[in-house]
């Protein structure tokens, strides 16, 4: 039997992103969730899929490499927000969780990625 042809020329990049209030994903109730597909084109329920995919491509899909913008100043009011990303980035499994001190700190790091 001939070898099966690959289903796509692109490695899959499909993620589910969530946001919730709390100190950890295990105890926080997800308040919002979106899907994000970055290959072969940007799509999903994310409101800014193209910009979010561009941010991820800029750090090679390494969520931990996302840094806070220098031009954003946030207060220190502690109201923890946890974000998660589960799925596949360029064929590799992704499981990411990060807790920010508040929504402003989340927005300063994620840019459009966590803006949903």
UniProtKB/Swiss-Prot annotation:
It is found in: Secreted. GO terms for cellular component: extracellular region. Disulfide bonds join 38-53, 74-104. GO terms for molecular function: serine-type endopeptidase inhibitor activity. It comes from the Bacteria. The keyword Protein biosynthesis does not apply. Inhibitor of subtilisin BPN' and trypsin. This is Subtilisin inhibitor-like protein 4. Gene3D superfamilies: Subtilisin inhibitor-like. The record marks 76-77 as: Reactive bond. It comes from Streptomyces lavendulae. The keyword Ubl conjugation does not apply.
């Amino acid at each position: 039997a001939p070898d099966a042809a690959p289903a796509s020329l692109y490695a899959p990049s499909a993620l589910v992103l969530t946001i919730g209030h709390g100190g950890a994903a295990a105890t926080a109730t997800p308040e919002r969730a979106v899907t994000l597909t970055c290959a072969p084109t940007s799509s999903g329920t994310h409101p800014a899929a193209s910009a979010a995919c561009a941010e991820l491509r800029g750090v090679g899909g390494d969520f931990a490499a996302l840094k806070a913008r220098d031009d954003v100043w946030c207060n220190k009011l502690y109201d923890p927000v946890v974000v998660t990303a589960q799925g596949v980035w360029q064929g590799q499994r992704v499981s990411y969780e990060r807790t920010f001190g508040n929504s402003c700190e989340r927005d300063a790091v994620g840019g459009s990625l966590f803006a949903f």
